[in-house]
UniProtKB/Swiss-Prot annotation:
Protein name: NAD-dependent protein deacylase sirtuin-5B, mitochondrial
Cofactors, names only: Zn(2+)
The record's free-text note on cofactor binding: Binds 1 zinc ion per subunit.
Catalysed transformations (reactions): N(6)-malonyl-L-lysyl-[protein] + NAD(+) + H2O = 2''-O-malonyl-ADP-D-ribose + nicotinamide + L-lysyl-[protein]; N(6)-succinyl-L-lysyl-[protein] + NAD(+) + H2O = 2''-O-succinyl-ADP-D-ribose + nicotinamide + L-lysyl-[protein]; N(6)-glutaryl-L-lysyl-[protein] + NAD(+) + H2O = 2''-O-glutaryl-ADP-D-ribose + nicotinamide + L-lysyl-[protein]
A GO term for molecular function: protein-succinyllysine desuccinylase activity
Enzyme category, top tier: transferase
Subcellular location: Mitochondrion; Cytoplasm, Cytosol; Nucleus
Gene that produces this protein: sirt5-b
Domain notes: In contrast to class I sirtuins, class III sirtuins have only weak deacetylase activity. Difference in substrate specificity is probably due to a larger hydrophobic pocket with 2 residues (Tyr-101 and Arg-104) that bind to malonylated and succinylated substrates and define the specificity.
Key words of the record: Cytoplasm, Metal-binding, Mitochondrion, NAD, Nucleus, Transferase, Transit peptide, Zinc
Domain Deacetylase sirtuin-type: 36-306
Entry EC no(s): 2.3.1.-
Amino acid sequence: MILLPFHTRRLVSHVYCGLKPASQNKGIALEMTRPSSNLANFREAFAKAKHIAVITGAGVSAESGVPTIIGAGGYWRKWQAQHLATPEAFSRNPSRVWEFYHYRREVMLTKNPNPAHLAIAECETRLRKQGRKVVVITQNIDELHHKAGSRNLFEIHGSLFKTRCTSCGSVKENYKSPICSALAGKGAPESDVQDAKIPVEKLPRCEENGCNGLLRPNVVWFGETLDSNLLGEVEKELEMCDLCVVVGTSSVVYPAAMFAPQVAARGVPVAEFNMENTSATTTFKFHFQGPCGTTLPPALARHETELIS
């Protein structure tokens, strides 16, 4: 038996988003044991749970055909996401960054929720009628959970389909395709494609009266702080949950990498559904390996003890 220390200061003090290894700072020690893959035992815990927190990452959307931009092969042209998704990159070359996000927006407009998204949304709707709660905390910016029907939803890294004005701060939904005429036909990801070098005045602009400021995607970039109010709400949900389900997350991006280990530290069952083990897997009670579109639906299906309404 090995003990792994995890830092457990309040989440709102860990509001930086970036790729870095799991914390090894001193804190509450989590007992590391081999997690169970017994579905029947998980279903017993699921049947008893009144407040379920579902934490999702890029893996849940990969089965919808969404390109993963973190990890092996995660390139757009010759840049990795962490070299484009930064305030510094936008300041240096807003045209290139907007091409990158325009490409991602156009791709996402063609994608649909997969069985994992749908299982989570159906579970939320079904359990709500029983006076039980399911909340989804996602690192994804693709809005597929929303499209699937999830309503108790925290998009902690923002959305591809919202913009924020760099001048007045106005945040608006935006599903235009293309988002501006200058980006039409731009954004191809191949490494030999040259930058469009769009003049800044032709990039997406704010339509608030008298503003006309440059818009940026309303997403959290590497090195930026997350909304402390939003994280406060997330923390409340994690403190109240009596079951935590982790789906398709690599457990390397903070602060989300802390969420499930923090829940496990107070003795709440945590079930991980993932294609492979992560640095946090051995701190969880359950682990189900394989495509989440296959493993998750039977885990969240109606339990025999549920009343049919």
